[in-house]
Amino acid sequence: MEWPINKPIYDINKSWEDNLENGPFIEGYKKVDRNDNKDPSKYIDFLGQKLASPIGVPAGPLLNSQWVKFALEAGFDLPTYKTIRSHEHFGHPVPNVMYLDLESEDKQFTKSDSGSTLHATQTIPTTMDQLAITNSFGMPSMGKEYLYKDIALAHSYLGSGQSMIVSITGTASSAHDFLQDFVDTVRIACDAGAKMVEVNYSCPNVVTGEGQIYHNPDAVYEISSTLVKELSSKNIPLIIKVGVMDDLEKMERLFQQAERAGVAAIAGINTLSMKVTDKITGEPSLGASRLTSGVCGAPIRSAALDWVSTASSIIKKQNSKLKLLGCGGIVKPEHFDDFLNSGADIAMSATGLMWDPYIAMKWHNNNKNN
């Protein structure tokens, strides 16, 4: 159960479609018994769902029901079904994931590093502390009929003390169509039996005039309040996914507007957006049209923890009822505790799961509090 056993369960040399159809790639994986199965009376309550633990997977790596099934069996009690759209959408071509060349093994970025330049490398890291990747998928999505069946199938795999979030986003060419598309997408999630919905505000969008929606608290309010109206009659809570913010006042306003809209929880961070280029040529590593991409893995943990701590402070300051989901850089089991101790109600790992599918079980079986 130590690095490296096998290649990541997501094959970075294959397309997103290939990984969806044939993954996760778990040859050599040995299922581990979980030693912390609790009495249901001791489950934690999160947005009305009873969970055996606060350990989850954020939107991204769980491409369909088979990926969700694997995460559930691997000890993640709150997986997120990857971001869906209202219609089939093809993502970017391979490469979608590349390793990054860091200055040192313990390199940690801060939020002020967003937008800086890094270089891709073919060198495979040899420890989880060295695990740094960039990813650019374009948020691909399967079509409506597939999603109805597959999200329902994913729900059928839930065991006692487990639940699932369905992540959504909007797609359109005008502000009005954009809002309606969010509604159309959330209806797919609801019709498929979603217990919780997360709306992704942390990926680029040109319609609002902002690089990312979460930087515009008023746009967040408008979209979120519309979605809450759709969800409230079905008693489905809304979570919003955001990223790092340099402006504390704007972050405080974001939280105010989110709660005012009826949002139940805020998740962060997604990735750190950086420029990734070839060290020799200076050309974009992922292709000419993708100069900027998301950085994930070990080196964003500091920025993510900073976000969680700040978010927790804002919630206390505002006497808010918002819950927090923290993610970013959790690549070792003890990192879950770092996030929980910093104020997160739920701690989530994506890159950590992909490269170490035992990470959640290590936490369960080694955690003295369980």
From Swiss-Prot:
Coiled coil: none annotated. The active site is at residue 203. Binds 1 FMN per subunit. One of its GO terms (molecular function) is dihydroorotate dehydrogenase activity. Substrate binds at residues 82, 135-139, 200, 270-271. Gene3D superfamilies: Aldolase class I (3.20.20.70). Its cofactor is FMN. It comes from the Eukaryota. Keywords: Flavoprotein, FMN, Oxidoreductase, Pyrimidine biosynthesis. Its EC number is 1.3.-.-. Catalyzes the conversion of dihydroorotate to orotate. Participates in the pyrimidine biosynthetic pathway. Belongs to the dihydroorotate dehydrogenase family. This is Dihydroorotate dehydrogenase.
